[in-house]
């Protein structure tokens, strides 16, 4: 049986993550407050950011940038600036 959380990103009840996917306090906050659906959306954005900005994930500055973008997207509702990407119209 899956666990349900009130997803802060989607503002609705949804299936929660099966386990903590990110380390530390931020990882706990994500596990407790973000749904599988929102996490999957973030992973797509993350991949586009890494590719578009040519981030080297071995560099601490790149990891810090990505973490800041992740927090803004998941908890503040801010879309990351991905050059050349036009979101689909609803």
UniProtKB/Swiss-Prot annotation:
The keyword Amino-acid biosynthesis does not apply. Keywords: Iron. GO terms for biological process: cellular response to oxidative stress. One of its GO terms (molecular function) is iron ion binding. The keyword Iron applies. InterPro entries: Fe_traffick_prot_YggX, Fe_traffick_prot_YggX_sf. One of its GO terms (cellular component) is cytosol. Could be a mediator in iron transactions between iron acquisition and iron-requiring processes, such as synthesis and/or repair of Fe-S clusters in biosynthetic enzymes. Belongs to the Fe(2+)-trafficking protein family. This is Probable Fe(2+)-trafficking protein. It comes from Pseudoalteromonas atlantica (strain T6c / ATCC BAA-1087). The lineage of its organism: Bacteria, Pseudomonadati, Pseudomonadota, Gammaproteobacteria, Alteromonadales.
């Amino acid at each position: 049986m899956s666990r349900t959380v009130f997803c802060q990103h989607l503002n609705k009840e949804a299936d929660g993550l099966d386990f903590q996917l990110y380390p530390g306090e931020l990882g706990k906050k994500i596990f407790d407050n973000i749904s599988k659906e929102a996490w999957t959306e973030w992973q797509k954005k993350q991949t586009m950011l890494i590719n578009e900005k040519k981030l080297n994930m071995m560099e601490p500055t790149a990891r810090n940038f990505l973490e800041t973008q992740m927090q803004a997207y998941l908890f503040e509702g801010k879309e990351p600036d991905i050059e050349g990407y036009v979101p689909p119209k609803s």
